[in-house]
């Protein structure tokens, strides 16, 4: 059985770990659009505020450690652009190379996360107004503080 998981932060990483416990022989491929997986996204404000002093403490797993522990193939900087449920294939864009390829699956799990709501307020798009959802948002905020 081959599982493809879209999203590698909280839900996707948890699903992958659970799948491995349930099926030791399954092929599991996890796609994450961002650079990091399985990080403490609830800790991001604490890092900005200095309560968590070391950035590395935000990261629970790396792609390498996740593979070593769970035998899950993790592909970061990989955006799933299209799902063909009938053919059981996803189209993936490798954000490093710009190349696009297809990956087949038997079962698909979607855990792509969310986007912050930006209310239609005057000035919401001005410099110095930030949303906080991921590590990249955190880094951008800290540059301006």
Task: Tell me what each language-model feature is.
Residues 4, 64-143:
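FAD-binding core/adjacent interface of flavoenzyme oxidoreductases
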Residues 1-77:
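Beta1-alpha1 glycine-rich phosphate/pyrophosphate-binding loop at the start
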Residues 13, 143-144:
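Low-complexity, intrinsically disordered or weakly predicted helical/coil tracts enriched
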